[in-house]
Swiss-Prot record:
PROSITE patterns per the UniProt record, alphabetical: NTR (PS50189), TIMP (PS00288)
InterPro entries reported for this sequence: Netrin_domain, TIMP, TIMP-like_OB-fold, TIMP_C, TIMP_CS
Species of provenance: Canis lupus familiaris
One MF annotation (Gene Ontology) recorded for this entry: metalloendopeptidase inhibitor activity
Gene coding for it: TIMP2
Subunit composition and interactions: Interacts (via the C-terminal) with MMP2 (via the C-terminal PEX domain); the interaction inhibits the MMP2 activity.
GO cellular component terms attached to this protein's record: extracellular matrix; extracellular space
Disulfide feature: C27-C98, C29-C127, C39-C152, C154-C201, C159-C164, C172-C193
Positions that bind Zn(2+): C27
Main location, first listed in the record: secreted
Residues the record marks as site: Involved in metalloproteinase-binding: N40, I61, K67
BP-aspect Gene Ontology terms: negative regulation of membrane protein ectodomain proteolysis; response to cytokine; response to hormone
This protein's name: Metalloproteinase inhibitor 2
């Protein structure tokens, strides 16, 4: 093989390596409004993690053991979920595969949304809504009790750039990224998308229950 051919093969090999996904890129999530996270989750709780360990969780198709991280938690309040308290939370062992890291020791409280596994267990990923409790606004905390649930039939559409539009009356346009370059902006912190009596949806601000006039069509 000539030098030119060897150089070409080397260049092609390097190009292939450069285009392969890196482990850190393996977990990719689309931003969601807190209300969407609430509505999409099976379980939403306020809790502390008290201990952690790695456990086997069955085998893959090749017979190799599947490892997961198990957090033993102390549930403080359940906003959505089964009648039984959640005792254990499971997640993947690495952030590269969307695993979540929680502080243990029982001091830091979290709002945790995820998928139910039954028997007091749930599973979480980096794509779920998991944030320290003390970072939530007072409106977000109060909306967990009832407000977000009122809008689960509505659709929140994120606007990544101007122009953007809604395609149906049951949508609310989420503008935080355009107006504040953040997914944790004003609409995320202080607004919920609520269905009105005619089936349309609109942003509602505040911690107080929506007025009947708002539900019966009133500009927010």
């Amino acid at each position: 093989m000539g030098a030119a051919a060897r150089s070409l093969r080397l260049a092609l090999g390097l190009l292939l390596l450069a285009t392969l996904p890196r482990p850190a890129d393996a977990c990719s999530c689309s931003p969601v409004h807190p209300q969407q996270a609430f509505c999409n989750a099976d379980v939403v709780i306020r809790a502390k993690a008290v201990s952690v360990k790695e456990v086997d969780s069955g085998n893959d198709i090749y017979g190799n053991p599947i490892k997961r991280i198990q957090y033993e938690i102390k549930q403080i309040k359940m906003f959505k979920g089964p009648d039984k308290d959640i005792e254990f939370i499971y997640t993947a062992p690495s952030s590269a595969v969307c695993g979540v890291s929680l502080d243990i020791g029982g001091k830091k409280e979290y709002l945790i949304a995820g998928k139910a596994e039954g028997n007091g267990k749930m599973h979480i990923t980096l794509c779920d809504f998991i944030v320290p409790w003390d970072t939530l606004s007072s409106t977000q905390k109060k909306s967990l009790n009832h407000r977000y649930q009122m809008g689960c039939e509505c659709k929140i559409t994120r606007c990544p750039m101007i122009p953007c539009y809604i395609s149906s009356p049951d949508e609310c346009l989420w503008m935080d990224w355009v107006t504040e370059k953040s997914i944790n902006g004003h609409q995320a912190k202080f607004f919920a998308c609520i269905k009105r009596s005619d089936g349309s949806c609109a942003w509602y601000r505040g911690a107080a229950p929506p007025k009947q006039e708002f539900l019966d069509i009133e500009d927010p």
